[in-house]
Amino acid sequence: MCTLLAPEYRAYMQRQLAAGGPPLASLTVEEARNLMREMQAADLSTYAVTSERHKVGDFAMDVIRPADASGPLPVVLYLHGGGWVLGDARTHARMMREIVMQSHTAVVFVEYGLAPEFPFPLPLEHCYQALQWVAENGAGLGLESSRVAVAGDSAGGNLAAALTLLAKERKGPAICLQALLYPVTDFDFASGSYEEFSTGLNLDRETMRWFWDRYLADDEARKNPLASPLRASPDALQGLPPACVITAECDVLRDEGEAYARRLAEAGVAVTSVRFAGTLHGFMLIDELAGDTQAVWAMHLLVAQLRQALGTSE
């Protein structure tokens, strides 16, 4: 067990190990998806929100807003994690409601097509279509389409980073903030954090290889900055929206997330980058850990960044 883990996270990992079960990478895709859904089962009854589902082509979006909202709301376009293979509105329901209630925004939660059924670049194209949909239809739905932030966790952080690159390349729609929560930014499995945390925690090297192989199997194709944003050129990074990058100390993805934050800063992008000590990958998402001090403070940071970028009141 990693000695850097805070007591709450060490206890969580001990419970997971005691429960047994096969490694995620040994499961079928459907078994892995069901496992993630089973692990995320928060009580949502205390959240006073409304949710409307909209279907666009091959994917769907949920527009979630405070039940007492009056007037147009700025938008957080949220791209979920799960290795591009797992995750949906159910797995992220509690976290999305926290963002809505604390930031006084509307979350547009994108259920992009999952790999391997929808490999790269289809999930990213779905996210871009969702951004366009907000720009074109938001006003009629009580959304301020001129004030949009993108956010995502893990593989969703990868998609959020790539979406800002794609929106710049295609000259819009405009994005005012990119919030990247312990994001995937490269396919290099030999970074310092990959070496340090390669086995024994809730996300390991074998599992990340399993995810990448289903999203984009070809190593040469993985060099595309829209798949690996860390490989984007300085010119491509210049002029991107301000970034909030949150990383977990005990996470194979830590170093690539922080490296991307540095690359953005070197390109002149305004960046807030914070590592939360003693935490695991996914610590803001895991319902069982939602009340932990580090998870609470990370949410406070995310909300503060969203409020500042979107101009929402206290």
Question: Where do the protein language model's features map onto the residues?
Answer:
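Short amphipathic alpha-helix adjacent to the substrate-entry channel of hydrolases
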Residues: 90-108
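Alpha/beta-hydrolase active-site loop
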Residues: 118-140, 302
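Alpha/beta hydrolase fold serine-hydrolase catalytic domain that processes acyl esters and thioesters
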Residues: 146, 161-314
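Gly/Ala-rich beta-loop-alpha elbow adjacent to hydrolase catalytic centers
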Residues: 152, 156, 160
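Gly/Ser-rich "nucleophile elbow"/oxyanion-hole loop immediately N-terminal to the catalytic nucleophile
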Residues: 135-150, 170
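Short beta-strand-to-loop junctions in surface cap/lid or active-site-entrance loops
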Residues: 61-72, 230-237
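A glycine/proline-hinged amphipathic helix-loop "lid/cap" segment
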Residues: 1-66, 221, 293, 311-314
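Short beta-strand element of the alpha/beta-hydrolase
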Residues: 72-82
